[in-house]
């Protein structure tokens, strides 16, 4: 596994555990379709949450959350709509969150959950 893929997988594991500890239920991981991938899909009460996970091992290239651009948010909205259609899912509300994971040199993770970014 490439280093970039390994740190991404690490971040997604950390993010999933973080969300579950916060009371969300992760219902899908790494959902793929020809248009792209959703890292995590979760339920927060009656709200369906589409989660983009961004992981970095340093701040040299900025905060992980800064990597989610307007273009990326537009893609996430399209992917969320496709996921909802393909799963015939119904939710009172839908939201897009970002979980930013910074892996420190000591191997610990600093996690920031940004709710409703899209």
Swiss-Prot record:
The cross-references to InterPro entries, in alphabetical order and at most eight, read: Restrct_endonuc-II-like, tRNA_endonuc-like_dom_sf, UPF0102_YraN-like
Gene Ontology molecular function terms on file: nucleic acid binding
One Pfam family assigned to this protein is: UPF0102
Domain of life, per UniProt, equals Bacteria
Name the family the entry cites.
Belongs to the UPF0102 family.
Query: What is the official name of this protein in its record?
Result: UPF0102 protein Bcav_2532
Give the organism, scientific name. Beutenbergia cavernae (strain ATCC BAA-8 / DSM 12333 / CCUG 43141 / JCM 11478 / NBRC 16432 / NCIMB 13614 / HKI 0122)
Q: What is the lineage of its organism?
A: Bacteria, Bacillati, Actinomycetota, Actinomycetes, Micrococcales
């Amino acid at each position: 596994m490439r280093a970039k893929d390994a740190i991404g997988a690490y971040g997604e594991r950390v993010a999933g555990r973080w969300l579950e500890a916060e009371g969300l239920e992760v219902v899908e991981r790494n959902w793929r379709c020809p248009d792209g991938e959703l890292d995590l899909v979760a339920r927060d009460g009656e709200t369906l949450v589409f989660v983009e996970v961004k992981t970095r091992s340093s701040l040299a290239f900025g905060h992980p959350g800064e990597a989610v651009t307007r273009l990326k948010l537009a893609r996430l909205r399209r992917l969320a709509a496709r996921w909802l259609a393909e799963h015939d899912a119904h939710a009172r509300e839908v939201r897009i969150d970002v979980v930013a994971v910074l892996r420190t040199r000591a191997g610990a993770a600093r996690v920031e959950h940004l709710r409703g970014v899209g």
